[in-house]
């Protein structure tokens, strides 16, 4: 096989992976759910990032009969017992509404001092081969930081304006794309995936 399905509707994410694979001389065509006819909607009912990534990868690999990459990411705040966690995208009550999500996060942390606002951004990536779900390739990435009391930066995506990385002295939203990718949870998980995918892929094809 020379096609990888990325279980997402985000073409930019698929393009990012395809370009990265070309750079390591593993030129696989990456498509998304938008390239399929009537793809199923997968409910993310898992209680962990790994469970949700596996749900999406398995369902879409089964539907498409293609090797499938799925990911799940989120923010876990220590003071909130790990919330928003797997509910990060819809924490404010409406899916992918960054303003509502950030407003709720700030409200939940109202009055909490800076030294108690630690948090972790997490990404899990899973690649599944059709009919071989016991052989999933799994990579993960994490980065620690803290939640500010007000947003900073122009990169207005998700919780990035509130997530401050002390070692860099910046929020994710204040970093360039390259700066963020070099240290981010997603960047870590993707680099691990790229390191392992060619060998795993060939093994799946030959068994």
UniProtKB/Swiss-Prot annotation:
Keyword hit for Nucleotide-binding: yes
Record keywords, A-Z: Hydrolase, Magnesium, Metal-binding, Nucleotide metabolism, Nucleotide-binding
Cofactor requirement: Mg(2+)
Catalysed conversion reaction: XTP + H2O = XMP + diphosphate + H(+); dITP + H2O = dIMP + diphosphate + H(+); ITP + H2O = IMP + diphosphate + H(+)
Record text on cofactor binding: Binds 1 Mg(2+) ion per subunit.
Family indicated by similarity: Belongs to the HAM1 NTPase family.
UniProt protein name: dITP/XTP pyrophosphatase
Organism: Lactobacillus johnsonii (strain CNCM I-12250 / La1 / NCC 533)
